[in-house]
Amino acid sequence: CKSDFLMADENPENIKGPCSSLSEDGHQDRKFDYMITNPPFGVSWKAEEDFVKNEAKNPDGRFSAGTPRTSDGSLLFLQHLISKMEPKGSRIGIIFNGSPLFTGDAGGGESDIRKFVIENDLLETIVRLPGYLFFNTGITTFIWILSNNKNKNKKNKIQLIDAEDKY
């Protein structure tokens, strides 16, 4: 990644790591206009549980919407990105497997996080992608597109796109 930055005449110091974005916010005081990511599917955050749960207690903390099961940190990555949104408007594109859409009990951590995203009108679009886009797996994946500055005609709406057979 740093070599790509150097070849593009960008500052490689903007690349943080190796570290976990959950316990070590490498861009603590920064906000971004656009963010695109593909966090690892089903990554455990058990090793960072104490840190994450402590930050979740802070109403201004990155994880204040809730904490999911420790076996899947996908929705923690989403909350991390939401915390980096510019107040004047940002967009996020994030690729998930189906877990963030469907797992968790009503009133549980995953459900609370989804509720936060919807009640704050952040979710703009979910696109279901074709299978086998990722090497050696037919897992179904989804692109979530979020915005904190939706067009007026998209306010309080979520667009669902089924692109499963478009590949």
Question: Which residues fall in each region the model found?
Answer:
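S-adenosyl-L-methionine
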Residues: 2-30
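A conserved structural/catalytic subdomain of Rossmann-like adenosyl-cofactor enzymes
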Residues: 29-167
